[in-house]
């Protein structure tokens, strides 16, 4: 009897099921061996992988999904304690936040004056300083020439003052001796005509008396007030008041030194 195609197909399917059932039986070799247990080196690789993942996570932008990524990368076998990886995550986030803040502060501090408008202003200021230097060279040269002329006049005055002092000293000595002779001959304040060798009148000389008052000092004011007020406290207040009313005169002048002072 010839077999039909449907029967042949059924036989083939049965054989296939039989083979599949035999292959699905567990064998001795499929049992987990001791070598499959995680070793210390694998733990080290896990820690190195965790440090690498931490450094890569510090460069991510969004912080909202960071915790979820953290849980995905670390399975429960690596971190069986939920609180442990929570603490690890918080420490990492806090350190990254602090580092970013320090970098931002350092950048602002180092670049706060390096903006384009400030650079442009610096360039303009440099250009104006160069122009001022050119003007100042001419002004300084003119000022230098004037100061040299002033120093020439000062030198002449000092030289003439030295000669004049000698003349003044000699004149004073002669004056004292003449007054002694006038007093000796009792000439008094009579005027005397003085002529030169050619009988030309040079001038009229006589003894003259002049009276001047000295400067009003604080002691004089205090003594005068005490004669009237007779109260030391009030006198002190009045003297202080008078002193404050004195006018103050200011003037500017050139002072010359030897150059070392």
Swiss-Prot record:
Keywords, alphabetical: Coiled coil
Comp. bias intervals (Polar residues): 1-12
Basic and acidic residues bias spans: 65-74, 122-139
Residues in coiled coil: 151-181, 218-243
Low complexity bias: start-end ranges: 23-55
InterPro entries registered for this protein in UniProt: DUF5760 (IPR043918)
Disordered as annotated region, ranges: 1-139
Biased composition regions of type Acidic residues, renumbered to the chain: 79-108
Name under which the protein is recorded: Uncharacterized protein L491
Organism for this UniProt entry: Acanthamoeba polyphaga mimivirus (APMV)
């Amino acid at each position: 009897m010839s077999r039909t195609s449907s029967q042949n197909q059924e036989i083939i399917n049965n054989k296939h099921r039989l083979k599949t059932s035999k292959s699905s039986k567990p064998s001795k070799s499929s049992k987990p061996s001791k070598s499959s247990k995680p070793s210390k080196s694998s733990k080290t690789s896990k820690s190195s992988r965790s440090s690498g993942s931490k450094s890569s996570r510090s460069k991510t932008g969004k912080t909202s999904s960071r915790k979820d990524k953290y849980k995905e990368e670390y399975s429960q076998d690596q971190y069986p304690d939920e609180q442990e990886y929570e603490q690890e995550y918080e420490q990492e986030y806090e350190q990254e936040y602090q580092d970013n803040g320090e970098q931002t502060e350092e950048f602002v501090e180092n670049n706060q004056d390096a903006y384009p408008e400030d650079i442009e202003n610096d360039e303009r200021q440099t250009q104006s300083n160069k122009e001022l230097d050119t003007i100042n060279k001419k002004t300084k040269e003119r000022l230098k020439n004037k100061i040299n002329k002033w120093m020439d006049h000062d030198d002449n005055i000092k030289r003439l003052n030295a000669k004049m002092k000698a003349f003044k000293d000699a004149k004073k000595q002669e004056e004292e001796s003449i007054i002694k002779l006038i007093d000796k001959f009792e000439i008094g304040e009579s005027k005397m005509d003085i002529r030169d060798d050619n009988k030309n009148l040079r001038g009229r000389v006589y003894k003259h008396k002049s009276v001047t008052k000295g400067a009003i000092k604080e002691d004089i004011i205090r003594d005068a007030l005490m004669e009237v007020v007779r109260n030391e406290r009030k006198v002190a207040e009045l003297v202080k008041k008078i002193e404050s009313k004195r006018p103050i005169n200011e003037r500017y002048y050139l002072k010359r030194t030897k150059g070392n002072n």
